[in-house]
């Protein structure tokens, strides 16, 4: 398949093999014991929703395959502080190097600069990356259903939960949602961006929301750019958001967050 996701996954498999060669799995597993305590990612989102507020996962993202460099002046620690002041519940930090110009160090810098729980935003395909996420200080990992078979999805989710992390299981269509619901993770992310074409439609979330059980926190991801987008989702009963680009394009990301979600 010659789509963007498959290209990314092929490269990710090579990257994981290279990392294993540099740092054996056993060494990584041993390092988990000295990882910083988890901060409670889902708990932070649920607390915001229970309070009647939007629960915002604010993304720390330098670039993307579809848009190129989004934020040339990229300082993860400053961005994290700005987001915390702006009212974010959690952070999402891109760590994919080749396609998003991310880095593991960006996650560490962002987390050390604030008190918010942090999602490691990457293409997780191997248990090695789950241990790696915990050692880096991640409080949550992303599992993309389109990138995994059912066995991988179950195994990686179970491992992450056993290490104390939360899991955001990401879907784009009903078939993927049915697979995601077999995993006992408390969050379902509906990505409005098709990872095979990178086209975006907010209707994706609206069409699928009724199929998400009430005991799962629904997070809408991608394409939330303006006040009308937020109003559309909140009117539909969706109160958890993952937003990056809209904030990365303004000088003060936290102020962008406040204006989009808390100015009214």
From Swiss-Prot:
Catalytic activities: 1-(2-carboxyphenylamino)-1-deoxy-D-ribulose 5-phosphate + H(+) = (1S,2R)-1-C-(indol-3-yl)glycerol 3-phosphate + CO2 + H2O
Q: In which pathway does it act?
A: Amino-acid biosynthesis; L-tryptophan biosynthesis; L-tryptophan from chorismate: step 4/5
| Transmembrane portions of the chain | none
- Report the Gene3D superfamilies cross-referenced here: Aldolase class I
Q: What class of enzyme is it?
A: lyase
User: Source organism's superkingdom?
Assistant: Bacteria
Name this polypeptide is given: Indole-3-glycerol phosphate synthase
The species this protein belongs to is: Stenotrophomonas maltophilia (strain K279a)
Q: What is the lineage of its organism?
A: Bacteria, Pseudomonadati, Pseudomonadota, Gammaproteobacteria, Lysobacterales
This protein's gene is called trpC
